[in-house]
């Protein structure tokens, strides 16, 4: 399943915006590492609690039956009552440490089962509960205490063997009918406790796995928000140390908000951030619509690349369409003071190198002469225009209308002939210009 990128903040019915999903995801991820162990312990405690209450029901039922029928003597009923009370307080012992509650439960169960089996004989089936305890002991003490669990299971096996060889099938303490009833009830209740406990443990584990899957999806969304999907997948490969790719053809765009410094100094911080969030979120939607890749945002500068990391033959045309839509979207916006938001946009094309750099807060970036030229096209551009060099003009002239600006001096490149991108040609009439179609893009 593809991870969804964090986009524009959801818009409520009253026009207000909620915090973007990515902020919530970051907060959740920050809490997640400290929760996993605690949740594992809590699951084990819940399993022990449900097992203890099932045991209370079983031992309490036996005590009531023995008191009502008088079969087995009052002290057998007393053992069951004492055992049921002890089981009932087991959930209260979790606060004293991870092993106090399970060891109290298991120890009490072992003593009670052995005492009853010794008094009434093996035909009553009390020893079956030892087998249930051996099967459930890992769930109760935890997998991190495997050696202890094995030891407790061995004790259960030893007690079963001891009863078999040391105690007669029927000691005569209970009448034959009571022994038969005890055997049936013991068999049914032992199976019931085992099935119920395992079912509850598996259900709790399934819920925990669903939570982990949701956390994984949030992690994937955060990673997809930082890196292109294909790059993110390559970054997960354990043998991959460096990600660096050369592209013989790609197009680069830089856009800058004109007069941003003055706006920032005269606008409240919260209003400025909300404005930039709306603007850049709208641009992000356009990037996705055109199948491009946003590289970075630096203050009021927005950088987009086409043909990276997925090469495409129409990379220049796609970026030109995006530039026209971008200026159209910006024209629909007003800053917090109600002023228009003019842009300067520059495009360039050529070979580039792209890769992931940094060991902390790593990022995906693009380098090359085309990047430098696109930046110069933006910085030397006129307000509200999209400036391109001659190489871009040659690629766009058949499908777009461009107006020559002339020759300008570009730092590091000398004199360059540049053009203004006006719009896309209409197929029916090459002389007619079609500007960018109006797009709201969530603004």
UniProtKB/Swiss-Prot annotation:
InterPro entries: A/G_cyclase, A/G_cyclase_CS, Cyclic_nucleotide_synthase, MASE7, Nucleotide_cyclase. Its cofactor is Mg(2+); Mn(2+). Keywords: ATP-binding, cAMP biosynthesis, Cell membrane, Lyase, Magnesium, Manganese, Membrane, Metal-binding, Nucleotide-binding, Transmembrane, Transmembrane helix. Its EC number is 4.6.1.1. It catalyses: ATP = 3',5'-cyclic AMP + diphosphate. One of its GO terms (biological process) is cGMP biosynthetic process. The keyword Transmembrane helix applies. It holds the Pfam family MASE7. One of its GO terms (cellular component) is plasma membrane. Changing residue 376 to A: Almost complete loss of enzyme activity. Binds 1 Mg(2+) ion per subunit. Is also active with manganese ions (in vitro). It is a multi-pass membrane protein. Changing residue 44 to K: Almost no loss of activity. Changing residue 43 to K: Almost no loss of activity. Residues 203-443 are cytoplasmic. Residues 251-378 form the Guanylate cyclase domain. One of its GO terms (molecular function) is peptide receptor activity. Its main location: membrane. Belongs to the adenylyl cyclase class-4/guanylyl cyclase family. Homodimer. Can also exist as monomer. This is Adenylate cyclase. The gene is cya.
